[in-house]
Curated annotation (Swiss-Prot):
It catalyses: N(2)-formyl-N(1)-(5-phospho-beta-D-ribosyl)glycinamide + L-glutamine + ATP + H2O = 2-formamido-N(1)-(5-O-phospho-beta-D-ribosyl)acetamidine + L-glutamate + ADP + phosphate + H(+). Mg(2+) 1 binds at E88, N534. Belongs to the FGAMS family. Part of the phosphoribosylformylglycinamidine synthase complex involved in the purines biosynthetic pathway. Catalyzes the ATP-dependent conversion of formylglycinamide ribonucleotide (FGAR) and glutamine to yield formylglycinamidine ribonucleotide (FGAM) and glutamate. The FGAM synthase complex is composed of three subunits. PurQ produces an ammonia molecule by converting glutamine to glutamate. PurL transfers the ammonia molecule to FGAR to form FGAM in an ATP-dependent manner. Gene3D superfamilies: PurM-like C-terminal domain, PurM-like, N-terminal domain. This is Phosphoribosylformylglycinamidine synthase subunit PurL. One of its GO terms (biological process) is 'de novo' IMP biosynthetic process. InterPro entries: PRibForGlyAmidine_synth_PurL, PurL_linker, PurM-like_C_dom, PurM-like_C_sf, PurM-like_N, PurM-like_N_sf.
Length: 733
């Protein structure tokens, strides 16, 4: 190969990597082989910088059917059914081309779920942008990016007939050069009918199904394993182009196939396309494979083996069928007007042998590529910025104008209702949505098959994680689980999407290592194992890294859907109770951001055992019928939580606390507001005492104002800002 140095640079391979490849092959690689190694050894596919930290996560429990290592995680939800779910990032593509980047992110995560045999029933997203309130070019750009991402998520999800039932948004300057788009999908399957990405049985046919292969997405996995600079727009050809109608056909064809006994395994073609799907299937099974690339359905002329192996064209799957059933498999996909071709077979060689019009164009041992990518032990160093920002302190002044402070927080984009966003999503399709977007806290979806409901929520406060990555990650796990618990459900498991800056920066690797320790500790205590996930590194532009953003999505089970607990006031005269203890904790808070205009101090400190006690208390109280509504206290503190419950329930409240002024906006964790009928108060207090949970009456529901201590605001005024304010910011009105 000519000009080896430039070739290695374009493939993001080092000289040491190249020498390792030569050692594996026993010769110099050709271009196809180099491309395969480049993709599979990329950060995006191999997790070479992060795997050592991920190994510490708790992944097992009695209810876990499948943990990390497959296309998605699987948990038992009773009566012979399972929930299949995962969250993944599509950050780099969405910054380059927001509509297609976000759309194909949704399509990719849905394929990960239905390739396991599950019908997708709900989606969430966690999306983060720069400051959309700015009146400069940065603000203008991020309003454009926001519009494109939201349109892409809605455009794909709506066509698939899968409801988008919730999500999370945040806005920080650290995302000015790198937005984050994290997509989550959950599906339902029979627990004894889960399909895996395997290719076993010598002589079994390998079948390509779905859309034709084009040149879109070429080099996508490698692109997602590097930082950006001002030339990022030139990477637009590496962004995949989605066709949701083709994916809808693929979904239905796959679900029809799963009712047969024709196949051994199936794998989505995601990052690195045909390369990753074939090597992963063979690698898991300890087998080899022969593939004839000239048989791959192509939509462009003159495509080469290199392009066919590395294209990331969407809506494609690779199937290992049972020998003799080839025609039956092909018949199903052709009925759904999809391409389907036998392109190879399983072998016992342990090698991937690729042919092009009868001539061998590549021969690579499977395991060194799929399972044995060189792992990196990158240096870590505590960031220099920590000493400075922690020294700023986070103690807010006690003498404040409560009304002025409340209105600043109430008018923040993080607080306001996002109907401008979720009105573009179909949240009710499939008619199973009990609590959708706009309902506050966790979303809730009915499982008609067993009468239960599944609660889900995606959460992370990147400001906490910047101040203290370990505590911030713990708080993300706890917040996500608490949003599920206030629906009356028991949190069972999590999927994560770990978004960080460049791993080549020792300070970023320190943040990553600390966050992983926090997740590990929280999941162990809270009994929510990690069953799937994703790592997105190199979220850096022109040397500026994003805040550590370990997005956590928790799934919980409510055995009886009719016991669903909502987050809006229900009845005038009901009592309001605060569960948990409030301290003066403002590091990384919305109050600190909006009122004081800085970021400093330390993140709130969480007692994980107290958090678990809160979850179990909420579950028991709801099961006993003691609760009318419940709301997590988090961003903006108690005052904002009460404001949201008032607006959502269209009822005011009268609250008196023992808190001093600004502590109404404290973000101490492990707290919730409960609405209860007075007849249940004594029993609830007894239950709280038994569970070791702090509980106190703070007021009642009623009136047309939000009244909290000396603060009194008309509900009508709050509704106007809450319901219409976000749209005004996005449209720059």
């Amino acid at each position: 190969m000519e000009n080896l140095a430039s070739l290695l640079k374009s493939h993001k391979l080092s000289q040491a990597d190249y020498e390792h490849i030569v050692q594996i092959l026993g010769r110099e690689p050709n271009l196809v082989e180099l491309g395969v190694f480049s993709a599979m050894w990329s950060e995006h596919c191999s997790y070479k910088s992060s795997k050592k930290y991920l190994r510490g996560f708790p992944t097992e429990a009695a209810w876990v059917i499948q943990g990390p290592g497959e296309n998605a995680g699987v948990i038992d939800i009773g009566e012979g059914y399972a929930a299949v779910f995962k969250m993944e990032s599509h950050n780099h593509p969405s910054f380059i081309e927001p509509y297609q980047g976000a759309a194909t992110g949704v399509g990719g995560i849905m394929r990960d779920v239905f390739t396991m045999g599950a019908r997708p029933v709900a989606s969430l997203n966690a999306i983060r942008f720069g400051d959309i309130r700015r009146q400069d070019e940065i603000g203008k750009k991020h309003r454009y990016l926001l519009k494109g991402v939201v349109a892409g998520i809605g455009g794909y999800g709506n066509c698939m007939g899968v409801p988008t039932v919730g999500g999370e948004m945040s806005f920080e300057d650290c995302y000015n050069g790198n937005i984050l788009v994290n997509a989550f999908t959950l599906g339902i399957a029979k627990s004894d009918e889960i399909f895996y990405g395997r290719a076993e049985g010598i002589g079994n046919p390998v079948i390509y199904v779905g859309s034709k292969t084009g040149r879109d997405g070429l080099g996508g996995a490698v692109m997602s394993s590097d930082s950006f600079d001002d030339a990022a727009n030139q990477l637009r050809p590496t962004v995949q182009v989605g066709d949701p109608f083709a994916e809808k056909l693929l979904l239905e064809a796959c679900l029809e196939l799963f009712k047969t006994n024709y196949i051994v395994g199936i794998q989505d073609m995601g990052a690195a396309g045909l390369t990753s799907s074939s090597f992963e299937m063979a690698g898991r099974s300890g087998s080899g494979m022969i593939m004839h690339l000239d048989r791959v359905p192509m939509r462009e002329q003159g495509m080469t083996p290199y392009e066919l192996m590395l294209s990331e064209s969407q809506e494609r799957m690779l199937i290992c069928a049972k020998k003799g059933y080839e025609e039956k498999v092909l018949e199903i996909f052709r009925k759904w007007e999809l391409d389907a071709e036998v392109i190879g077979e399983v072998t016992s060689s342990g090698k991937m042998e690729l042919f092009w019009h009868g001539e061998k164009c590549a021969e690579i041992p499977v395991l060194p590529v799929s399972e044995e990518a060189p792992m990196l032990d990158r240096p870590t160093k505590e960031p220099a910025y920590l000493a400075e920002i922690r020294s700023k302190g986070a103690q807010a002044p006690k003498e404040i104008d409560l009304k002025e402070a409340f209105m600043k927080l109430w008018s923040a984009p993080e607080t306001m209702d996002k109907s401008w966003v979720y009105s573009q999503y179909d949240s009710m399709v499939q008619t199973n949505t009990i609590v959708g977007p706009g309902g506050g806290d966790g979303s809730l979806v009915r499982v008609k098959e067993n009468g239960a409901a599944l609660a889900m929520s995606a959460d992370c406060n990147p400001r906490y994680c910047y101040l203290n990555p370990r505590e911030g990650a713990k708080l993300a796990v706890a917040e996500s689980g608490r949003n599920v618990a206030v629906r009356g459900a028991r949190p069972l498991a999590i999927t994560d999407c770990l978004n960080f800056g460049s791993p080549e920066n020792p300070e970023v690797m320190w943040q990553f290592a600390e966050a992983c320790e926090g997740i590990k500790e929280a999941c162990k205590v809270l009994l929510t194992p990690v069953v799937s996930g994703n790592v997105s590194l190199y979220n850096q532009t022109n040397g500026v890294d994003i805040f550590p953003t370990p997005s956590i999505a928790t799934v919980g089970l409510l055995p009886k859907a009719q016991k669903a607990l909502l987050g809006a006031f229900k009845k005038e005269g009901n009592l309001l109770l605060l569960v948990g203890e409030t301290k003066s904790e403002f590091g990384g808070s919305l109050y600190q951001k909006e009122v004081e205009g800085f970021l400093g101090g330390d993140a709130p400190v969480i007692d994980l055992h107290r958090e678990l006690a809160l979850w179990r208390f909420l579950e028991e109280a709801n099961e006993a019928g003691f609760l009318e509504s419940a709301k997590d206290v988090n961003v903006g503190g108690l005052a904002i939580a009460l404001g949201k419950m008032s607006v959502l329930g269209q009822k005011g409240c009268k609250v008196k606390t023992a808190l001093k002024g600004v502590d109404l906006f404290s973000e101490s964790p492990s707290r919730a507001v409960l609405e209860v009928s007075s007849e249940h108060l004594a029993a609830l207090e007894s239950l709280a005492q038994k569970g070791g949970v702090a509980l106190g009456v703070i007021g009642s529901v009623g009136g047309e104002n939000l009244e909290i201590d000396s603060l009194s605001l008309p509900l009508q005024t709050l509704q106007e800002i809450y319901l219409r304010g976000f749209a005004k910011i996005v449209e720059n009105l």
